C-alpha cells in the first residue's frame, strides 16, 4: 500500500493509530504489547515517515511529557486525527552539536513573543503545521538557563522555508529563517527560561526515534522503501554473486548485527521502564542503530561491487544510493560522539567532560572571534 497524506488520514480515522497515547488526548491508552503487535502485522505496509518521525515519536511524545493540558488536547488530538503535522526547529547553522548554544532569540513585547533567528536540518518541515522551536529568552544567565520552547505555526508570514537537497537526491530536510515571528503566551511549552527541560525530553525521544526504538511509532513499514532492511539474498542475485560463500558469510554477520539491534530495543525499553537503566539509557539504542546501519550499508555495497556505482538517477543498485547517505546515520538525532558522551556521563557515571562555558552567562561566552 502506497503511503501519503491521504493514506495516513484514512488510517487514523479508522483507528489504526497510536495505541499507547492516553485516551484523553485521542489515543487508545493500551499497553506497549498492543503497539508491538500492530507494528509486526503492518510491517508490509508503507507508513508516511513524517507522521512517525518527528510528529509522534518526538513531538507528541515531548508534548505528552512537558506541555500544558490545553496544548496536549489541541495538538496531540489534531495529530491523531491526521489534521496536524509537527516538526522540530532545533539545530542552527552556527550551533553544531551544542544545542544549548542556540542564538535564535525571543523577546517579550507586551503579551506577545517575537522570535528572530535561523534553524536548519528540520526533518519534513515543508509539510508541517507547527514546529517546536527552541529560542533564547535570557542572555545574562548560563546557556542552559535562558531558553524557552515555543510552538510556532510554520505558515507564519515571518517564516521563510527552503528545502535542502542532499547528495543522494533526498530533500526531506529544510532550513528556516524567522523574522519577527510573533506568538502568544499560549505558544510557550513548559516554563519561560526553563526550555532546556523540554529540550532534554525532546532529545531523549529523538534518540529513541532515530534508533527505531520509540514506543510511539506506529507501523513497521517504511515510506517508499527507503528504510526497508536490505534483502541480501536478492542483492546477491542482482549482483551475480548468489553462489558465493564469502557473500553468505558477510551477509550473515550483518544479519546478526540486525538481530541484536532488534533485541536491544526491547531490552532497553524494559530496563528504562522498570528503572534498571536511567532515561538516558535510550541513547544505547541510538548508538547501536547507527553502528548497525553503517555495517549493513558497508556490507551491501561490498556485495554489490561495481553494480553499486551510482550514475544517473535510476541507474545501478539501491545499495550505492543508500551508501551516499551512510554518514548521516551517525549525525541525525545527535552525533555518535555525543551519544557516547551521554552514555558515559549519564549511564556509566563517568566524570563530565570539561566545558569552558559552564556556569558563565551566555552574553559573556565567546562565539567565534566575537565576544
Protein language model regions, located:
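Alpha-helix capping/hinge segments and adjacent helical runs
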Residues: 12, 122, 283, 287-371
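Internal helix-loop-helix
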Residues: 12-83, 124-130, 213, 258, ...
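A short, Trp-centered hydrophobic/proline-enriched beta-strand micro-motif
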Residues: 82-90, 133-134
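Glycine-rich phosphate/pyrophosphate-binding beta-alpha loops
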Residues: 95-96, 120-125, 167-168, 328-333
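A structural signal for short hydrophobic beta-strand segments in well-ordered beta-sheet cores
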Residues: 104-107
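A short core secondary-structure module
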Residues: 112, 116-162
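Glycine-rich beta->alpha junctions and the first turn(s) of the following alpha-helix
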Residues: 159-262, 329, 365-371
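Short, charged, amphipathic alpha-helical segments
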Residues: 248-253, 280-287
Amino acid at each position: 500500500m502506497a503511503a501519503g497524506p491521504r493514506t495516513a488520514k484514512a488510517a487514523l480515522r479508522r483507528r489504526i493509530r497510536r495505541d499507547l497515547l492516553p485516551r484523553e488526548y485521542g489515543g487508545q491508552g493500551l499497553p506497549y504489547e498492543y503497539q508491538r503487535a500492530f507494528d509486526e502485522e503492518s510491517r508490509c505496509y508503507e507508513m508516511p515517515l513524517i507522521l512517525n518521525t518527528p510528529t509522534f515519536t518526538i513531538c507528541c511524545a515531548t508534548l505528552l511529557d512537558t506541555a500544558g493540558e490545553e496544548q496536549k488536547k489541541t495538538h496531540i488530538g489534531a495529530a491523531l486525527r491526521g489534521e496536524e503535522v509537527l516538526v522540530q526547529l532545533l539545530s542552527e547553522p552556527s550551533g553544531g552539536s551544542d544545542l544549548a548554544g542556540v542564538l535564535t532569540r525571543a523577546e517579550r513585547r507586551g503579551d506577545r513573543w517575537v522570535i528572530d533567528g535561523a534553524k536548519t536540518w528540520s526533518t519534513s518541515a515543508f509539510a508541517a503545521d507547527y514546529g517546536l522551536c527552541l529560542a533564547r529568552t535570557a542572555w545574562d544567565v548560563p546557556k542552559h538557563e535562558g531558553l524557552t520552547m515555543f510552538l510556532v505555526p510554520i505558515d507564519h508570514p515571518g517564516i521563510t522555508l527552503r528545502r535542502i537537497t542532499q547528495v543522494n537526491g533526498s530533500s526531506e530536510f529544510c532550513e528556516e529563517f524567522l523574522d519577527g515571528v510573533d506568538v502568544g503566551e499560549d505558544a510557550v511549552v513548559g516554563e519561560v527560561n526553563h526550555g532546556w527541560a523540554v529540550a532534554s525530553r525532546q532529545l531523549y525521544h529523538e534518540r529513541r526515534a532515530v534508533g527505531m526504538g520509540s514506543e510511539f511509532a506506529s507501523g513497521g513499514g517504511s515510506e517508499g522503501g527507503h528504510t526497508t532492511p536490505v534483502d541480501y539474498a536478492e542483492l546477491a542475485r542482482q549482483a551475480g554473486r548468489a553462489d558465493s560463500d564469502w557473500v553468505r558469510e558477510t551477509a550473515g554477520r550483518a544479519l546478526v548485527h540486525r538481530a541484536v539491534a532488534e533485541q536491544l530495543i526491547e531490552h532497553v525499553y524494559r530496563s528504562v521502564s522498570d528503572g534498571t537503566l536511567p532515561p538516558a539509557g535510550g541513547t544505547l539504542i541510538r548508538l547501536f542503530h547507527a553502528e548497525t546501519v553503517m555495517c549493513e550499508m558497508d556490507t551491501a555495497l561490498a556485495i554489490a561491487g561495481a553494480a553499486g556505482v551510482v550514475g544517473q538517477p535510476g541507474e545501478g543498485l539501491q545499495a550505492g544510493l543508500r551508501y551516499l547517505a551512510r554518514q548521516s546515520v551517525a549525525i541525525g538525532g545527535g552525533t555518535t560522539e555525543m551519544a557516547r558522551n551521554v552514555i558515559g556521563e549519564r549511564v556509566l557515571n563517568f566524570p563530565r567532560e570539561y566545558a569552558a562555558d559552564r556556569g558563565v552567562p551566555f552574553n559573556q561566552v565567546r562565539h567565534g572571534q566575537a565576544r
